[in-house]
Amino acid sequence: MYENPILQDNINKLMKFGYEFIKPASGRLACGDSGAGKLQDTNFITQVIESMLYDKKDLKGKKVLVTAGPTMEDIDPVRYITNRSSGKMGYSIAEEARDRGAEVTLVSGPTSLEMPFGVQFVGVRTNEEMLNAVLEKFDKQDIVIKAAAVSDYKPKAYSQKKIKKNEDELSLPMIKD
């Protein structure tokens, strides 16, 4: 239905008059087919509308890089050390910069947050991955905001195999990262 040429012509005509559209999501449709035509998530729709209604565009033309969330450092193939950072502050900063007209890149460690609309997202896991992602984009940015909760320490040695539970205690030497 969404791909129908008549519908697309009508959408294009309305866009020429200044109307804006939120493109549909893709997936399994009510008719049983798959493709574009599903209603977008309501949080996504809310973000798009808020961004359109935001009057203050003082960051228009600026490139902003924001880091967010925690990083994880592996101990063995099944365990890691991290912190409880939710990433909310970094994501909120990225959304605000986007709403104010900036071209935003969000470099984020693992979080349960939804990826913000209209933001270039780079997902990372470790300190090293975050550093490399930031350095790759750094020179092209006007503003860099470091809101991530990067791990301060990492295990001195990574165990290639899962550490067995043979002992009552485990000593885990750490080094500054």
Spans of features found by a protein language model:
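Short glycine-rich anion-binding loops that position phosphate/pyrophosphate groups of nucleotides
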Residues: 27, 69-73, 148-156
